[in-house]
A protein has these predicted regions:
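Small-side-chain secondary-structure face that scaffolds active or pore-lining regions
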Residues: 80-92, 109, 115-119, 175-177, ...
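A surface-exposed, glycine/aromatic-enriched loop/edge motif typical of exported proteins
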Residues: 1-23, 111-153, 209
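Residues embedded in well-ordered regular secondary structure
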Residues: 1-82, 119-122, 164-168, 185-187
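Flexible hinge/switch segments at interdomain interfaces of large molecular machines
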Residues: 32-36, 155, 159, 216-218
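Outer-membrane beta-barrel channels and translocator barrels
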Residues: 52, 63-64, 98-102, 187-189, ...
Length: 257
């Protein structure tokens, strides 16, 4: 904090364009905070220690003619920013049936994901905050305004990005995908092989963003009817494909055709 204040003084922040009472008062207010021991490390405020969790259950069985496999998996991935995370639940069911020279395979997979963005804002906001600023007020509450450089021709109000965590806001994305793959293999002879595959997938998703009127984004909006917003976007996609292949392999002495 002391180094930051000294750098501002040496750069002429409080003397550029001539000394004034406002500039001197502003400098004294920063000096008092430094002498009081304020030395906030802003870079760790929005960060969290993230531990990823994975859980899976697999069940397989069958005989030579019919085989099956069931799978359920859950993956929880917290983000580096506080209160950000992504949860993915996956389930799949696979069948394989062999009848003489024909092999049938079918696989169905379901994916459901929920992602929450952090209400703590972007990390770059915290890199611009000076260590002599107090994030909390006298009663321990998170302050909305941190600083005022209006006296030296700067911003009239520096907002605290932590303030947006004191109320309910939302930035959440949900996506659901179903995929099916059906495959047929036919071997009329040992040398001849035909394969056909059909795949189909459909995904739907939406994103909800809600920011109430007290959000710092609307601090400069004077019309109260324009403060706060809610946005919802939706997406849907369907994809399919067909693959047909044939192959013939024949060994003639030491050569393959």
């Amino acid at each position: 904090a002391r180094e930051t204040r000294d750098a501002e003084l040496k750069s002429g922040l409080y003397t550029y364009g001539g000394e004034t009472v406002e500039k001197w008062q502003l400098y004294q207010s920063k000096l008092r905070e430094v002498l009081a021991g304020v030395n906030t490390y802003w870079l760790d405020k929005p960060l969290q220690t993230a531990f990823q969790q994975r859980h899976t259950v697999t069940l397989e069985g069958g005989d030579e003619a019919l085989r099956y496999r069931m799978y359920v998996g859950y993956n929880s991935s917290p983000g580096v920013m506080k209160d950000s995370k992504r949860d993915v639940l996956t389930g799949s069911l696979d069948f394989q049936y062999r009848l003489k020279k024909v092999l049938l395979k079918n696989s169905i997979t379901l994916d459901n994901s929920v992602a929450n963005e952090s209400p703590w804002g972007s990390f770059s906001e915290y890199t611009r905050l000076n260590p002599y600023l107090r994030p909390y007020g006298e009663n321990g509450e998170i302050q909305k305004r941190l600083d005022n450089f209006e006296g030296v021709g700067g911003e009239s109000s520096y907002l605290n990005p932590m303030y947006n965590t004191t109320f309910n806001s939302k930035d959440q994305s949900k996506n659901f995908t179903v995929r099916e793959l059906f495959k047929v293999e036919y071997n009329p002879t040992n040398e001849l092989r035909f394969e056909g595959a059909f795949n189909l997938s459909k995904s739907v998703g939406h994103r909800d963003i809600f920011r109430p009127a007290q959000h710092t984004l609307f601090d400069n909006v004077t019309d109260p009817t324009l403060r706060g917003d809610y946005r919802r976007s939706q997406s849907e996609a369907v994809n399919w494909g067909i693959d047909l292949t044939g192959s013939w392999n024949k060994q003639l002495e030491d050569h393959y055709l």
